[in-house]
């Protein structure tokens, strides 16, 4: 589908070209500065220089010559100095945008820019045998939003949960389970037991060298594929995945694959050989395999004792993804503190000859802090675990729902509270630049009057409520004369609804879900202004009421789509 704003730009280029004054290859349409009262502009400096004419004179001549056809989305054409300004035709825009939203439905906002290409997104990636905490939630939520955004851009998207299921720590975990017994619980309680077993064994190991030897034996047995060690390790992995899945289900997270680090173990010797053969790495004096590339600090891909590290497995992971999926992009959603690691990783895989035509992207993010700005940390004893965070969010939302909507059935109130509570957590992560640290501020997160998920969800529910009231009064959605929607607040809302496809493109280009969050917030705000200034059910005429009901329906549908891109539910009632 070619959306209204795309057609508007095409109309502008065609209108300028039709004058015969400017070659097509010199026509570049841009968005004007905020102080210019227009929707798009053609800055004539470049064209005037090539043509050898005065820029202001060229703009004035074009403004006087352009004659848009009757079905064009071009309204007014004016010249201000060297700027040729174009405004949208309000009535035609209203009809075009609202018809597009109705026709496209849940697909409104999607484009085909990425058709035929594949994107791999690496996100969440918790460690096995540990509870998921708020430190995991940022990668999980940002990554899932990027999955939605790139699918909306037309890409085939592979969401991969790169589990931390390998490493020397598993020797301690297996030894601890053999010594003290396996956890008897499920879910987060089981993960807490495993953490306690690990901590207990680690503490006792400091005073008992035999325990350290035992952990080393289990680690070696696991690496060598010992059946007993592998069986115990797999039991631990399965237990951890079941616990994590409970959180993923509540957050609406869906992965295409969950390949852990262990999956790539067999590839590591070949990767090290390739790194040496390509001279991307070299053997140090102590026998370790190291790399020193692009003026980055030296780093290891194989220890002197023959052991491998995260970097080795990450190189193997890229090689596998290139062979298996042939992606145009591989995107890593990982803590900003890992920026150097990814610069080194991308440098060595390119030096090895991999991914020469592939975009390798690290999407970094900041930490979650307490209201007084302190980072949450296990060592500081202020860590918040994910399941407890979600439970707390839903409980707080339930109290608000019960207070405001006591007339709704209990089951519906519970569903609304889950949607609002989980939505608050997701939006709090996505509404600003991911590099910034975020704070858990429940009053702001659950407010229905500010920049919060609850406010956006309430705006959607208000739209649906208006449509239900219309139906109760016997006024059904019907064909309407959309050219009646000329009030300034109607036009601002329509223009903003038309921007969703542009917002999707911008969010993808910047790897920035906050662009969609900002679009949703502005939609809700503009709808609020429209609702205050333009009576819907009590409009001056039945024809205007029908047109405004169509605008309400379009707003609800578009806002639902925007929220879905963020992974947030849009309740019908609140």
Curated annotation (Swiss-Prot):
Pfam families: Arg_tRNA_synt_N, DALR_1, tRNA-synt_1d. InterPro entries: aa-tRNA-synth_I_CS, Arg-tRNA-ligase, Arg-tRNA-synth_N, Arg-tRNA-synth_N_sf, ArgRS_core, DALR_anticod-bd, Rossmann-like_a/b/a_fold, tRNAsynth_Ia_anticodon-bd. The keyword Cytoplasm applies. Keywords: Aminoacyl-tRNA synthetase, ATP-binding, Cytoplasm, Ligase, Nucleotide-binding, Protein biosynthesis. One of its GO terms (molecular function) is ATP binding. The keyword Cytoplasm applies. Its EC number is 6.1.1.19. This is Arginine--tRNA ligase. Its main location: cytoplasm. Coiled coil: none annotated. Monomer. HAMAP family: Arg_tRNA_synth. It comes from Chloroflexus aggregans (strain MD-66 / DSM 9485). Belongs to the class-I aminoacyl-tRNA synthetase family. It is an enzyme of class 6 (ligase). It catalyses: tRNA(Arg) + L-arginine + ATP = L-arginyl-tRNA(Arg) + AMP + diphosphate. SMART domains: Arg_tRNA_synt_N, DALR_1. GO terms for cellular component: cytoplasm. Signal peptide: none annotated.
